[in-house]
Regions:
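Repeated loop/turn-to-beta-strand initiation elements of outer-membrane beta-barrel proteins
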Residues: 15, 49-56, 92-99, 133-140, ...
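Cleavable N-terminal export/targeting peptides
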Residues: 1-16, 245
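Outer-membrane pore/translocation modules
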Residues: 18, 58-157, 236-251
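Short glycine/proline- and aromatic-enriched beta-strand/turn motifs that initiate or cap beta-hairpins
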Residues: 9-70, 85, 252, 258-260
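Structural signature of outer-membrane beta-barrel domains
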Residues: 22-26, 61-65, 104-108, 143-147, ...
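Residues on the lipid-exposed face of transmembrane beta-strands in outer-membrane beta-barrel proteins
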Residues: 19-23, 40-46, 83-87, 101, ...
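Predominantly the C-terminal beta-signal and adjacent terminal strand-loop region
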Residues: 206-261
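Detector for outer-membrane/organellar transmembrane beta-barrel domains
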Residues: 118-204, 209
Length: 261
């Protein structure tokens, strides 16, 4: 009886945890690190039924090499924390519009104390939507950053999930990253000719994910991605850049788990 009562009380609440190890780290369309990184994404909240799902999120990134710390050890890189609201609109039996809105803060702490940019916080608003259907799922993300990182970023693409052997799936996807002129400079760097970047698409990524549904609450996955900077001027700027992770083409991958309770 107590177990049934506890299950009834806890059922509206949820926790999602996704730990990953990646061979490199691409953040908002920019190759930030070409060495292994560990990422943990945690979400928790309350399912309010017709009013959506309210919660909090935390995204931690840590280096698995000593490159990102002045003390030459594995380094905590940055964390993101914010409030979230998710809402689904049922358009028909097989079509659902899913929305995810967040107000978050990104905090850089604990490495390279000689650089002010290594110890800072900025905030942002973000909306993500996807149209879930039996065919091809289109999706996009729009993020506006403030307080020292004033730029607009977007991501848009499509994906298709294929299920086989009951508990396995294969999901190919393709998407572009881009944004305002400030975002373009953040991703590519300064132009060799001294001109200002225009807003637009800065990169395209091809992704292939293979997953295994271990049980109702746990799935495991591996993925591979091909990252490509687009545009002749942008690729030339990458070639001329002294940034240690300046690669106009990059292949990487990772492994991870998805847990939901």
């Amino acid at each position: 009886m107590i177990a049934i009562l506890a299950a009834g009380i806890l059922s509206p609440f949820f926790v999602e945890v996704t730990p990953e190890v990646r061979s490199s780290y691409v953040s908002l369309g920019k190759l930030m690190e070409d060495r292994p990184m560990q990422i943990t994404n945690v979400r928790g909240g309350y399912d309010a039924g017709d009013f959506g799902r309210f919660g909090v999120r935390n995204w931690d990134v840590s280096s698995l090499t000593d490159r990102r710390h002045d003390a030459h050890r594995h380094a905590f890189y940055h964390t993101e924390f914010g409030l979230t609201w998710q809402y689904d609109v049922k358009l028909s039996e097989d079509w659902t519009l899913r929305s995810d809105i967040t107000r978050s803060w990104t905090m850089y702490r604990g490495f390279n104390r000689d650089y002010a940019s290594s110890n800072r916080t900025y905030s942002w608003w973000q909306i993500e939507q996807e149209l879930v259907n039996p065919y091809v799922v289109p999706f996009y993300r729009l993020r506006k950053c403030f307080h020292g990182n004033d730029y607009l970023y977007f991501k848009a693409g499509v994906r298709k999930k294929f299920t086989f052997l009951d508990d396995f799936y294969l999901t190919p996807s393709v998407y572009v990253d881009g944004g305002s002129s400030r975002n373009y400079r953040r991703v590519i760097g300064t132009r060799p000719d001294g001109e200002k970047w225009h807003s637009g698409v800065s990169s395209v990524t091809f992704r292939l994910e293979l997953g295994w549904r271990v049980c109702e609450n746990v799935s495991a996955f591996v993925f591979a991605e091909q990252y490509e900077v687009v545009g002749q001027a942008a690729r030339h700027a990458i070639e001329s850049s002294s940034y240690r992770c300046a690669h106009k083409d990059w292949t990487h991958g990772g492994i991870g788990l998805r847990l939901r309770f």
